[in-house]
């Protein structure tokens, strides 16, 4: 085949893959990253696991919604090496895998984070994921012991592992599990965001720490969202305010939004616009339309539905009935306004 023709075909194929990737929805992108991680774990390709993590530490490596791909890397890793109901054989196998990873690549940040992840997951398997009142008294001591082991491991290997911003997200989860006082948690958060100011997971795990059901209140969420917005305004505008409330809605407020929160909806709308200016992804559009419905903002919901793709994403809406209610409510208003 003529060399120029071959190059043309290869270029066209590359463009096709770019288009296909752009059209893939958010969950498909995240699942694809997780699948890559799973394949590398199963093939025991330690070098490739590290190379992928290094690649995803680049702030430019994001999904269509703007979320760092590094977060999906660690979610995928957790899905492979941990389980909520692991057998003894599974635990031993995965511990051996992580040990082998560390032996083969002792300076791997991701391998060290994986080891801490195993300890943390075992703690939660002992405790259970329910409310504190459902935990058996005899399970508290071993839960706290394994959480402390995870904290100590992270501290011991900080010089290796904190080249990865997820070290700080991991430590913030531990801080939440141990109920650190606000001052101590704030010091950790400021250290992490001082090194990695754009890593969303640091803001998201801090949001969970500040939820009313954990260590904070609705007011502490709003105060934090405003501080975070000011610190990231040069890159995000008001987008961080909106993203923090996104986590708060998913983690606690949900159908009690906005009544149970202290949100400034006008500011959150500005944040929606700022996120959409950089990441006009259908995942963002549908979530923001849903939040607009919860907030009772018909005009904002209608404008977002006008930009939405053809299919509702059930990861956003939970049910087709919920989507139809919101869509009908917003669209009918828009049609009436257009007719006047």
Where does each model-flagged region fall?
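Bacterial N-terminal signal peptides that target proteins for export
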Residues: 1-9
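Bacterial N-terminal signal peptides
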Residues: 8-17
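Sec/Tat signal peptide C-region and signal peptidase I cleavage site
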Residues: 20-24
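N-terminal mature-domain "stem" immediately C-terminal to a signal peptide or N-terminal signal-anchor/transmembrane
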Residues: 25-65
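Short coil/linker segments at helix-helix boundaries
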Residues: 47, 55-107, 117-235, 239-270, ...
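Intrinsically disordered, low-complexity segments enriched in Gly and acidic/Ser/Thr residues
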Residues: 251-300
